Every structure is written in C-alpha cells, then in structure tokens.
Amino acid sequence: MANHNAEIEEIRKRQRAQGPANILAIGTATPSNCVYQADYPDYYFRITNSEHMSDLKLKFKRMCEKSMIRKRYMHITEEYLKENPNVCAYEAPSLDARQDLVVVEVPRLGKEAAAKAIKEWGHPKSKITHLIFCTTSGVDMPGADYQLTKLLGLRPSVKRFMMYQQGCFAGGTVLRLAKDLAENNTGARVLVVCSEITAVTFRGPSDSHLDSLVGQALFGDGAAAVIVGSDPDLSVERPLFQLISAAQTILPDSDGAIDGHLREVGLTFHLLKDVPGLISKNIEKSLKEAFGPIGISDWNSLFWIAHPGGPAILDQVELKLGLKEEKMRATRQVLSDYGNMSSACVLFILDEMRKKSIEEGKATTGDGLDWGVLFGFGPGLTVETVVLHSVPATITH
C-alpha cells in the first residue's frame, strides 16, 4: 500500500505545472455595425415605434449622455429589427428569433477573437488542450464550445467547459477556472473565449421598467479571447500577465440587486437595488483578503482592471478607495469605446492596458506597476477578484 501511495504522489507531481498561470495572448473582436451614443436615442425610439413616448425618450437621452459611452458595436441592425418586429416590443414572444441569431453569431464572433489570440500566441492551435467558452446568451446543445471547436478546427480531444448566462462577473470566473486548469495540468494551454451579443436583451422601452432602459443605454457586443498556460516556452511564448490568485464572493444584503430571466420575450434584465453603493461598500474587504497575504494595502500602488458595469460603479469605487483618476483609465477607455460587453469587458481592458503600457514606454505591462487587481461584478451580487502580476514590457508583445 505504501508503495502505491508513493506512485500516486509521483503521478500527481508529474500532472502539475511548476509555476503560476500566465496570460500568453489576447485577441478581441466586435461586429462591424457601430452605433454612436449621441445618435442612439433617436434611432432606438424610432426603430421600436416609441417616438410618442417623448418624456421617456428624454430620460433615455439623459441616461445615454451620463453613460460615458461614445460608441458601441451591435450585431442587430435596423434591417434585422424590421424583419423581426417582436424583438422591438417591450414584451412580445421573440425568443426563437433571438436564439436563431445568437446560436450562430456568438461562436462566430468568438472565433474571430480566438484566431487573433492564437496568432499572437505563436504555437499551432493543435497545442490547445482546454477550451472555456462563456456567453450570457444562446443556450444550445451541443453548445457554443462545440461550435467554436469545429469553427477553429481544434482537436476533437480538447477538454471543453461551457458557461452560459453567468452575466457581467464572468470575465473573472473564466480566468479563475483557466488558472486552476493550467496549474494542475502540466503543459496545459487553455483557450478562454467570452462572446457577448445583446440580441437576447434588446427590447423596446417601457414606462414602468426604467431598469431595462438602463441596460439598453449600456450594453454592447464584443468577444475577447486569451490563452492561459503555466511554465511558458520563452522561445515562442511571451507572457503578458501572471494570474496569482482568484476568489469569488456573494455580497451581503444584495439579493435581487441584478437579475436576468430567460422568457419567451428574451432575456429580461432587472436592476433592483443600489448596485454602485453595494459594490463600493464591500470592495475594500475583497481587496484586503486578496492583498493582505502579499502585504499590500495601498490601492493606488496597483494597476486596475474593473468591469465597467456603468460609470456610477467606477465613480463610487474611486471615491470609496481614494483612487487616483488614472487608475481607471484603461477601464473607462473600454467603456467609452465599446459600452458594457458583459463578461468580455475585463479581457478588453487587459488588452488596452498592455498595449498602452508598451506604447507609452512603461516598464511593465501593468502601466509600469508590478501588482494589479481584476474585478468582475454581476448578478448575485457576485464579485470575482483576481490578483495579477505584470511582466516587463517589451515591444515584442
């Protein structure tokens, strides 16, 4: 028996990587249809036949002006909405029309982002051992993970994980899962794809549901992909960030703060409580738990990647923690250029940060700093906290 224990221990040792997980490449993609926030209220109320609701339109205009979003990308075009008028109503049976679109387009947009990440990574796609696919839309069987495997031509033996309808915190969830897979399977290379298309949540305005209108002012489409692995082969691979630790928590007294329900009318979105207040009130606890063991308590010494659920969340977190304005620069840039793309946002922000750090000649991929934090916020209220370590910035990234 003792002999077997030694053998098992040896097998376990061989199965595990030596070092921490690294993000080895990042790719992003958006649909070609770009909508400018300044023009959106007129378009939205016209296409949904709601121009008679002039007071509501004024409220929506103010929401769009306060959103800090300049433009967004959306797969659904005016042509699609004219062909599917039920999607434009606030509550009309429209799930089939929505599903038919997202089941095809979510994997397709994901493929575009994944292909860019694979190209940057530098290894053949046959070396991908695991796939994590995440989307808030389009439950189907076989899932978007299967469709992407086929579209990309990955090996049939790739180990797949499919995450549906987790919502806006899931960009942190996928990194947490990828870290565990990379560190516990020697040689593992995990392709992570978050692909989000708002066709499931788009709907016309309703006087009695202003929370739904908030979503219409914020949400955009986009896909992001990263490749995660431990013990990088430095002759080919160029690490961008190390994943040091990852945690998830449910905030106290936040039941029902953000809900989504899949119905015949599509995915309905409900914002029931003071979400920015709940997040800002609890965020320091998550920071202390994550950075206490490392001996860090100055939150301005970190580089920041925070899911931009909306400008009020970022404003209140900054205020509560006394963050300098530049801390959220990459986060606010992504919000301005793309809107809230749910799970994909934080991966877009990682991409923005490493690119800007190199362009501006910073010493590291993390805006010249060593340690950073990535936050996902979403339904629950659930918070994902990922501790990152940057690497020296070189032009080859």
Swiss-Prot record:
PROSITE patterns: CHALCONE_SYNTH (PS00441). Its EC number is 2.3.1.74. InterPro entries: Chalcone/stilbene_synt_C, Chalcone/stilbene_synt_N, Chalcone/stilbene_synthase_AS, Polyketide_synthase_type-III, Thiolase-like. It is an enzyme of class 2 (transferase). It catalyses: (E)-4-coumaroyl-CoA + 3 malonyl-CoA + 3 H(+) = 2',4,4',6'-tetrahydroxychalcone + 3 CO2 + 4 CoA. The keyword Transferase applies. Pathway: Secondary metabolite biosynthesis; flavonoid biosynthesis. The keyword Transferase applies. The active site is at C168. Keywords: Acyltransferase, Flavonoid biosynthesis, Transferase. Gene3D superfamilies: 3.40.47.10. GO terms for biological process: flavonoid biosynthetic process; polyketide biosynthetic process. Belongs to the thiolase-like superfamily. Chalcone/stilbene synthases family. The primary product of this enzyme is 4,2',4',6'-tetrahydroxychalcone (also termed naringenin-chalcone or chalcone) which can under specific conditions spontaneously isomerize into naringenin. This is Chalcone synthase 2. It comes from Daucus carota (Wild carrot). The gene is CHS2.
